[in-house]
Amino acid sequence: MFLHQNRFAARVEHMHTSMQRIPIMSTAPVIEHGRFAAKATVGESFQVSATVFREGHDELACEVVATDPTGVRRAPVAMTLQGCGVSQYAATLTPDVMGAWTFEVRAWSDPLATWLHHTEVKVPVGVDVELMFAEGSLLLDRIIAEHTLTAGDLVTIDNTRAGMCDQLRPIRARLAVALGHEIKEIFSRFPWRDLRSVDGPYPFFADRTRALFGSWYEFFPRSEGAKRSKSGVVTSGTFKTAAKRLPAVAAMGFDVLYLPPIHPIGEVNRKGPNNTLTPAPTDVGSPWAIGSAQGGHDAVHPDLGTLKDFDDFVRRANKLGIEVALDLALQAAPDHPWATSNPEWFTTRADGTIAYAENPPKKYQDIYPINFDNDPDGIYNEVLRTLKLWMSHGVRIFRVDNPHTKPLWVWDRLITSVFATDPDVLFLAEAFTRPPMMRALAAVGSQQS
């Protein structure tokens, strides 16, 4: 039985079946069969569990092993049985660095534990006494054959064999020798793992702590420090004037400052108050109608200042313990540079015009939605370039505008690319949608919603 498992272990491990030799099932946390990463944050402990069992009554053991983002395999963590009758084992992992981790569950047959259990059950009641001690002697032979032992170890083994096999001694005395601390200590240093089985690896991602929650405050830089003259002319607020508001934001306990789009605003089909299509010359339009002759998603609206002014704003916020979150709205005004350079990125209607955004009965004539199917690689490369530009200027949080209206592959590909080099970047999905879409947005990388 358990004495001979090692003879067949190598052969069994190379069999190709859907079921491991030691079945490992219902491993968690696993998202969509491992297609997506489970989530945790640095320093956050979470449970890994699995149903592990085998045929018959022989003993088994299992552990979970994590591999960190650098490819270093961490020390195994023993899994313990949770309750009786369900064969569920669990252990706790606590990632200590950000990035993409994996874990795997390992299980094996434990011939020593099997012998100890059978011996403790049978010998005291006089069942198979000599057979159990003989099988224990074979285990001693095996450990001598497979490992390099010290002289002290060999003495302990000889004494154990002599004591438990001495039929002139009382059975309980022989049992005490067989189960003695000294021999158990030797076995603990040289554990056997017969019939090894592995489930995984499965991915999990360790975010920084801010991914769990943040206290967000929103303001329009244009409104902070804006002035209206006696004649009614409005002078826009800037990053410099908006920075004066930062201490008050920090004093209220906020640690994330969200800015709506700070880019040039389209002039074609610009909206006025109450969604009118007849704006006054001084109406600035909707910040979400991104892009004009002054630039697109990679530019700062001239009314707000320069890119250097933005950098100074971010630095001042950071000194106060505030992170700046930028809006990521993948859409374009009719006069966005993309509309000229890459008209194929949009949907052309039967009359040759580019389709504007609609959410019946609402119409957004000042916004062109992007058609991600016409040139997916071109769009991906441009959006990734834009993201990395703002990341290089200190933005580590993006509030993604209406992500549920874009194909999920867009976020899967973009966020995966960002995490590969910058695992500290966070994405909040601003989505009002059905649970399946919300779950999918989380699966592809959005930490918040």
What are these model-predicted stretches?
Residues 213-237, 265-312, 340-377:
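Aromatic- and acidic-residue-enriched carbohydrate-binding clefts of CAZyme catalytic domains
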